[in-house]
């Protein structure tokens, strides 16, 4: 298990979520970053590796929590499913992140579903064992609290944007987020290297795939973007977002 844990520890992780704050539009240090070798070894001792193919569930909404899953490879999508069947994507999480909050010690029902968006490898850490480690090591406890605080800020920002921003503003904000975190400058363009479908973007902003397709086509006609997704004029997307 050590190689996978080492990769998660050494990587700079980032998620994808709906946010407009510059404090959230940045790579996120992995859960294990900053921990001593001894604390990393303690976490390795309680962990069990799990491999998932694309589309396989980590858990379903309503399942009883049993612990957290540290992502070693791949991409995990967390989403809420309404009784109507409509889904709202909360975030995509990458290596170095964990999924399984907010009840990380495993005593309540999961509030949303998490699924592998691509082939992924995770390390499962049982809640009771994780609680014991948090009581024994203040550094581990603080690392868990910091990660939970970041997730809380992400979900709070998402709720604020869904409630106060138009769907067009949310799309523009998401494109700005992707450009800041996953964009690579090539000449006068910013090329977003992460592959996301129109459906992925729609789920993140609370819209439909058809609407996103129409809006991206319009932005392309206006010379703001070029598929896939190359941002030509970042300032235009930011107009009116203050």
Q: What is the predicted function of each stretch?
A:
Residues 135-206:
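Polybasic "coupling" helices that flank or enter modular domains
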Residues 180-242:
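Phosphate-/nucleic-acid-contacting segments
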Residues 39, 91-153, 157:
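Cyclic-nucleotide recognition modules
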Residues 2-54, 99, 103-105:
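Cyclic nucleotide-binding regulatory module and flanking cytosolic helices
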Residues 68, 90, 122-123, 193, ...:
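A residue-level structural signature of the nucleotidyltransferase/glycosyltransferase Rossmann-like core
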């Amino acid at each position: 298990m050590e190689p996978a844990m080492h990769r998660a520890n050494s990587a700079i992780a980032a998620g994808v979520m709906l946010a407009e704050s510059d404090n959230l539009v940045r790579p996120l240090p992995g859960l294990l970053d900053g921990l001593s070798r001894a604390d990393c070894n303690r976490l390795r001792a309680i962990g069990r590796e799990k491999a998932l193919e694309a589309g396989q569930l980590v858990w379903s909404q309503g399942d009883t929590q049993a612990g957290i899953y540290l992502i070693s490879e791949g991409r995990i999508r967390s989403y809420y499913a309404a009784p109507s069947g409509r889904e709202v994507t909360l975030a995509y999480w990458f290596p170095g992140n964990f999924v399984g909050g907010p009840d990380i010690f495993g005593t309540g029902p999961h509030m949303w579903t998490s699924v592998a968006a691509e082939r992924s490898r995770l390390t499962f850490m049982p809640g009771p064992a994780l609680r014991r480690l948090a009581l024994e090591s203040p550094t581990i406890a603080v690392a868990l609290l910091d990660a939970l605080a970041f997730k809380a800020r992400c979900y709070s920002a998402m709720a604020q944007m869904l409630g106060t921003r138009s769907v067009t503003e949310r799309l523009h904000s998401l494109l700005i987020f992707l450009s800041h975190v996953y964009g690579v400058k090539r000449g006068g363009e910013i090329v977003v290297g992460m592959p996301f479908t129109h459906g992925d973007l729609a789920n993140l902003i609370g819209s439909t795939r058809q609407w996103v397709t129409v809006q991206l086509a319009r932005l392309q006609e206006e010379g703001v973007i070029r598929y896939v997704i190359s941002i030509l004029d970042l300032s235009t997307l930011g107009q009116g977002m203050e």
